[in-house]
Regions:
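Positively charged, low-complexity terminal tracts
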Residues: 1-81
Length: 81
């Protein structure tokens, strides 16, 4: 698992999400879809007012080349959280 803040270009050790029931359901659906079809690569969950967004991605050896270069470096770096 990698938790990445693209604005600061830093990995995070943990994150807390406070979700509405609708947002939680949307996140669960997106995660389920990606688990069943990793080739879809990533999904987005937005807050009700679209002021915040969570991007989730599933990576495998087979779909790693579909990520941008920065993401590939992050995902290949096994020594960091």
């Amino acid at each position: 698992m990698r938790i990445y803040d693209p604005k600061s270009k830093r990995q995070l050790g943990e994150v807390t999400l406070y979700l509405t029931p609708r947002e939680a359901a949307e996140l669960a659906d997106a995660a389920r879809d990606l688990a069943e079809a990793p080739s879809h690569h990533h999904g987005h969950v937005s807050s009700d007012d679209y002021s915040r967004e969570v991007t989730i991605a599933v990576y495998t050896a087979e779909n790693l080349s579909g990520f941008d270069a920065e993401s590939q470096m992050l995902l290949k770096d096994k020594g960091k959280p």
